[in-house]
Amino acid sequence: GGPKPKAPGIGLLATVGDNFARAKALAGIVDAIIVDAGAATPEQIAELGAVVGLTASNHAAQLPDLKTLGADFVVIGLGADAVALRSDEGAKVLRLPLDTPDGSLRAIALLPIDVVLVEETVGKRLSVDELLNYLRLGALSSRPLIVTVDTDFAPDQLVSLRDAGIAAVCVPVERDDDLAVVSAFREMIDAFPQPPRRERGLDRSAPLVSIPTAAGTPLAPREPARPEPAPLPDDDEDRVQAS
């Protein structure tokens, strides 16, 4: 027997603005905390003892110095200066609206972007239409997707995002009361059931969700090499020529 394998979960992030008191309260609950870059000091970030991301201003000409501040990743918007993408420090998370055109999403593969964060916030319930829109962003950008959910979002809906291949959810924490909401989300994620078995046949040549490998391309089974035809023996070649 032994213990049952733990069900796969979903990442849990929180944004706290410049409120480091709330950030400290969340440090042992969430997988990463996002704070405003202008309000962060190296001492505050080190005190959190957590994975920390910084939100750059929308028109930033350069990214925050992640190494000096001790942060792990930066969140940028479409208005950021393109030169900021040249920085090789930490991971880059790009905020995108749901209505981003297909061509722009495909072009993300050419940029040093690690993760896509959806700008719009999901309300209390998740509709199939919304889910399809999120999956479009993830599939066309070939990047892991973070979905922002409101504090009113029903915790039992989190498993639907997990089953669809969403990498993580991000919760805006704007009040002290929101801390309890994030804790409830953590409890729900830790108690996730195993994903449902898919009974119908699947095309295994394409991944269910386009999450890139380290090389930046989705995993897919390799086609077996076709054997070369064996050469004809000399006497057979003579027989063919004679005929």
Q: Language-model segments: which ranges?
A:
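Glycine-rich phosphate-binding active-site loops on the catalytic face of alpha/beta enzymes
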Residues: 32-41, 72-84, 115-124, 162-184
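Catalytic cores of alpha/beta
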Residues: 22-25, 60-68, 100-110, 151-169
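C-terminal helical cap(s) of enzyme catalytic domains, especially alpha/beta-barrels
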Residues: 175-242
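Structural motif
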Residues: 13-19, 35-39, 54-59, 75-79, ...
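Conserved anion-binding
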Residues: 49, 54-143, 198-201
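A general structural detector for well-ordered alpha-helical segments in enzyme core domains, enriched
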Residues: 22, 41-44, 48, 62, ...
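Hydrophobic secondary-structure block in the mid-to-C-terminal portion of proteins
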Residues: 126-174
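Conserved N-terminal beta1-alpha1 strand-loop-helix module at the mouth
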Residues: 1-56, 221-243
